[in-house]
Curated annotation (Swiss-Prot):
PANTHER family: PHOSPHOGLYCERATE KINASE, PHOSPHOGLYCERATE KINASE 1, CHLOROPLASTIC-RELATED. It is an enzyme of class 2 (transferase). Its EC number is 2.7.2.3. Substrate binds at residues 21-23, 36, 59-62, 113, 146. This is Phosphoglycerate kinase. ATP binds at residues 197, 314, 340-343. HAMAP family: Phosphoglyc_kinase (MF_00145). Pfam families: PGK (PF00162).
Amino acid sequence: MTVLKMTDLDLAGKRVLIREDLNVPVKDGVVKSDARILASLPTIKLALEKGAAVLVCSHLGRPEEGVYSEEDSLAPVAAYLSKALGREVPLVKDYLGGVEVKAGELVLLENVRFNKGEKKNSDELAQQYAALCDVFVMDAFGTAHRAQGSTHGVAKFAKVACAGPLLAAELEALGKALDKPARPMLAIVAGSKVSTKLDVLNSLADICDSLIVGGGIANTFLAAAGLPVGKSLYEADLVDTAKAIAAKVSVPLPVDVVVAKAFAEDAEATVKSVKDVADDDMILDIGPQTAQQFAEMLKASQTILWNGPVGVFEFDQFGNGTKALALAIAESPAFSIAGGGDTLAAIDKYGVSEQISYISTGGGAFLEFVEGKVLPAVEVLEQRAK
């Protein structure tokens, strides 16, 4: 995968437009989770250090396209950036006709989704974005799977289009895990439905040595093995699909599980052998014996890809399985990559972020890359690098 990198370019005196993913939760005008903003800071600082005139753009929320709405304004993000960088970061509302920015200065452009044609990837809008800069930097991996004006279109028309450090690091880490993984490679794929992660499961079944499944997905695999799942969430129509995946790759199944009679924060948790699940039981986590077996496998792996918690970890009594696996990944010598919103929440909860080799910032983009799909925003950078 060959793309131009921002780190290799001379940016002195150049107008540099950086597409970041600053789509953060905001409540009452205050940023509630700053992870994405923090991830973008090194790129912004580097462009300023290189003497560029820097314009940063992003989307936020899902406003009606072409219509300004205060609740989806990037004003709280501009305020946060001003504080974090110790300098005023003006928010520019009307910028499609051009913006005055001097070398060493930084401005934040208002929500790109307020511009008509952003989602449809209109060439006219993309050309207006491109006219704002000498160099376009795509640094938002989380939106790389969307062909939109500020992620894909602008890269077609900008004088120079390159990958920012965040995007480049993401592509490198995913390439390391998927192209030539050190063996043995183990993947954890968990979620409520096989149907939503079918492409991921099939793709990883071709690459991995072992595939640990969790959540509702695991229940479908248990049913495929003829084991009782009680009233747990599972997909009866995908039992044959689960059998086909298990025929391609080793899918170790739980030997014990944690069950409850109801899905509730105060539900009583009971550990049972997987064979003893009753008709009115719901499986909400893997049991301690299973957690130990899976943990040993993780510690013996050389590459680990983790997507999804293996239990309902939001309720502490059903979080022990996910906690045990998180700690095992942290202890493992493997190159480990983790992605997906719930996975990141589990990593935070169990305090293992420092011990995981790479944490992906992109939810949908992460999954599409793992599925082997082409990410439009990356593809256009590759074409421009030729």
